[in-house]
């Protein structure tokens, strides 16, 4: 084992291995008429073309590569649903340039996963892996050793002339001694970084920074911080060893330093993981695997070639498709909007629902079924909506329910009509960790009690017998007895927990009994530590509400701790 391989293995032992996240749900065809899916395909295809043109012509795009790639995958699915061929890899890059490349830029086809990598590598030999440097693709043209052209990639056939910027980029040799009479190189202009770790820092907008400096009319001081990574030498030496050695002699050291021979897909996996974690002088977004054998430059076209492939890192942003929109009423009478999405895996967690807050916020986001959103995991693994990246062309109108009559003191009972959602939310809170913490009792169980009309108010479950509980389909006698005993033990829960379970707006510990709490005046509450005038009013409104007092009276008859009548 050579020293370099040993270094890699040791590095991996002390580093986190890449977790492949962001898996899309199993691709299925949308339940749309043929006419609509044709419209949606056309709209998405046009948008992707606009973003692609911005990327290749201007060096930046309104969306990240992660988002672009995932939406391109979605386009492929939709096209396959209509029996259309996959044109995403062979489609020419949109846009025009003025200056002809001596050899076309081929671009890279992206491998989906390790299985695709293994399949592509099978039967190929003399393979090498390099970091996929995230920068601005260019052509360097030398005549007699002198740099005569620096061209942007453009559409792969023609690009912009940036030659006047070359003297300000010290990483580009202006003259190469003993160079071939005609030398054409293709590579990446990148922002020089100091120990950049892709896994920790991501892309940091490096490519757009370089593109902006190159497109300015006057030379930017930033050009002094630009490096170059040569990844193609059309019609150059036949072996990679000779190629990288000569490039180093000519003044392009990065190619030699970051090109490694690979024998199997496991070698590629190892280097990909290493470069994802390791401090590097540039931003990367994956690796490129290439074979030594290439066609002559005259055969290169502005479409992905078959002699090199990209395998990108797991996406930092994850796209989900909105399947449906649900409106829920919380225990305090506040409505929230929950997006149901096609299942997506982020890290080790499958995401199916995303709470986005109030109806007002939903309207501001302007989200409809079929839209594509980006998600991330916030604290405790809770999914968070980050952005809407694609809106379907045909938008179905959805009307939110009217919740004006609901508030913090409504729906302590199942009736009147319309109360069931808030009533159910109250029950879920009551049995949850913020209330009485009754193990194994959640929304599904309470929903069954409501459905079978076995409960009509927030504490009516205390009257249920084991036989009544067992009458619910799916609950046998043994489980019914266990639930009954849990309910009876709940009577001994501390008084403060019962207050919380009922919805008391508590911000301080309340250890007194119900009768004592009830007799406190507004001013007494307001002067207690941690309670101001506003919260004191909320507490008094809660304590004086007829429904709350009726619940307290019932709990007194059940001899619940803290609610017993005192002489």
UniProtKB/Swiss-Prot annotation:
EC number(s) per entry: 6.5.1.2
UniProt-listed SUPFAM superfamilies: DNA ligase/mRNA capping enzyme, catalytic domain (SSF56091), Nucleic acid-binding proteins (SSF50249), RuvA domain 2-like (SSF47781)
Cross-referenced PANTHER family: DNA LIGASE, DNA LIGASE B
InterPro entries: DNA_ligase_B, DNAligase_adenylation, DNAligase_N, NA-bd_OB-fold, NAD_dep_DNA_ligaseB, NAD_DNA_ligase_OB, RuvA_2-like
Name this protein carries in UniProt: DNA ligase B
Family note: Belongs to the NAD-dependent DNA ligase family. LigB subfamily.
Annotated gene: ligB
Native source species: Yersinia pseudotuberculosis serotype IB (strain PB1/+)
Pfam families (alphabetical): DNA_ligase_aden (PF01653), DNA_ligase_OB (PF03120)
